[in-house]
Amino acid sequence: MNSFEATPVLPPSQAPEAAVRGATAASIRVLVYVGCTALALAISYLLGKDMGWDTLDYHFYAGFTALHDRFNQDYFAAGSQSYFNPYVYAPFYLLAASGLPALAVASILAAVQSIILWLSYELALEVMPVDKPRARIAMATCAVMWALANPILINQFGSSFADITTAEFVVAGWLLLIRAIRAPGVASMLCAGVLLGVATALKPTNALHALSALVVVLFLPVRWPVKLRRGAEFGIALAASFAAVCLPWSIRLEHYFGNPFFPLLNGVFRSPQFPVTPMMDHRFMPDSLAAALWRPFALALPLRMEDDELASPDLRYALLLVAAALMLLWWLWRRFRRNAVEPEPSRDVPRADRALAALGCGFAIDWTLWLSASGNGRYFIAMACIAAVIGVALVFRLFAARPKLCAYVIASVFSAQALQLYSGTQYHFHAPWKNRPWFDISVPKKLASEPDLYFVFGVQTNSFVYPFLAARSGFINISGDYELAPARANGARIAALIRRYSPHLMMLVQDARFDADQKNDAPESSAMNDALEPFGLRLDGRECSKIAVTGGSPPSVIIYTKSDEPTAAAQSIPSAASTTDYFSACGVVPVTAVDATRAATERKADLVLDRLEDSCPSLFQPRRPVTQYFGDLRHGAVWARRYPNTSLTVWVSHGWIKFTDPLRGGPATYIGRIADWEAAPQKLECGRRHGVYFAKQISSISAQRWR
């Protein structure tokens, strides 16, 4: 039997003392768990009700689709996210739709989400020697507080986001692997594989954490044949649990799209209803090796668009890097001294040190994979908790001989991060608490009972409204994060839905007019007609419904039609005394005349945009998206293409080609005259530098030298 597998037997004189220590540790564990949950509940209450972009865009709708088959009547209703595995959002949907007050719903979610702090505590205990119980508990408590001091984690307590929930599966899986280092066994490996497989199935971005967990397996204190067998058991359990969770949804995706992971992996399965170019979010990826090396320190600064859309400064990664460098120097110094004056040490490595080394190596691999795949901090919550454990463990080891200095260092770092949380962090929008359900929606009988086909316009789909309309209604987002066109494979599906629902066709759009509470006609309709015209439709402003969103964005939604009287809820809220947003749902009818000049100008726009994409494929990807039309009465046609991988939008108008970055803002970048691109393809110098995309047209002389 391996020495690590042996069960220690305590002498009789030490047994009572060990029992007392065990009882004390158990009571402290309960206090830590209760404290973590209380903190999560307090944070959720202080932040308010989460009404962020993703909650309104697809979280609530995803939970709805997990329990209701929408494939026959909806089509990209919430954009491309409509077809991600929705089961993880089902609990939020059930709670929010139950009629419970929003505060109760958020409290339940926050309590469940606090489990990630429990797991961080348990993981920290595993990387400290058991012969130092006080230091072990103190370090674990500090690790929990450091795990909590994550702006992205704090922003999600009590929210609809699934990042924390799936991160709990990841941390639990890693915890079991670390425990297997102290006591190798089949059960730990199988359970870890199951947990990481479930996490990956529910949120594919967790695949990186499952892959890097294999590094931890290499640190098992067993012979190589046994390591390989344990690794195979881990992999089989992971694959089996992944398949079990994915299978029900994947069968539906395969039936409707020919891709069981649609829209992911479409380069492999090649469904004609989505681009075959891989979906990659380049927003937070480093643009150079220097930027990647600097990233731990960049994340410590209160800057936007580092690993989140909002400023989310986090000192843990800089601390971890500095502590790891100091630990390496200290180890080299001790090794040099030992070689000079001490006998050769034993080959046995303490189990806690081996566990910490495994955790550190696994984290380093995960960090590298994460930066190369997305760099999005929401996808790194599990590893952020593990980073807190590693960082605090290294600090405790560095200053083990000087506990007071260790306490000063920990307190200083905590104080600096607390200051960042207070003054440097931007928090998501949260609505104030009221004793009302999460979505307080009143729908007139007509909309609740008569099914219509709703066309949605815009990247923000506001799909949270869909479940409250007639059950057999259908929804299509024709112009969002993925543009749909009648001439492509998407067109056949849209045409079939139009035929089925005609003449019950509607368009749902946000009404930005200042006097929208007094007008039941259609808002500015040119952009909507531009989106509808390719499908042979136009807006009918004479037949509109009004959706009033009151008290924030939005704690209450009241829907009434032009022919109906407003509901009592709507009448009780004077528009002048409340903050109210409005949506209009207007009728859609077939077009009576087609603009003949539009097709000709579209061919010219497609020509120059195709040439632009071929000249700089790294910026404008995926290539060949749908070209959008925006009528301009003063300057003529305006054409645009949106590139989801880089979040750029290219405009062809006013004689010029230019692109904008809506997420980062700033002025438009001009990349040549339309006439020049029509005449011949142009050479470009393009890329991304310091987080900013650029493209410069190379002059003819420079182009000749370049050739």
Q: Which sequence ranges carry the predicted segments?
A:
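Perimembrane helix-loop-helix junctions
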Residues: 5, 12-14, 18-19, 209-242, ...
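Extracytoplasmic catalytic/substrate-binding loops of multi-pass membrane glycan-assembly enzymes
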Residues: 48-62, 68-92, 99-103, 256-262, ...
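Hydrophobic/aromatic-rich transmembrane helices and adjacent perimembrane loops
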Residues: 59, 156-157, 162-169, 199-204, ...
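Transmembrane-helix motifs of polytopic, lipid-linked glycan transferases
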Residues: 94-95, 103-132, 172, 329-335
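Hydrophobic, aromatic-rich transmembrane alpha-helices
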Residues: 124, 298-349
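Membrane-interface transmembrane helices that cradle and orient dolichyl/undecaprenyl
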Residues: 132-134, 165, 171-189, 199, ...
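Signature aromatic-anchored transmembrane alpha helix within multi-pass, membrane-resident enzymes
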Residues: 194, 214-215, 236-239, 243, ...
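Membrane-embedded, lumen/periplasm-facing catalytic core of multi-pass transferases
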Residues: 412-490, 568-629, 634, 639
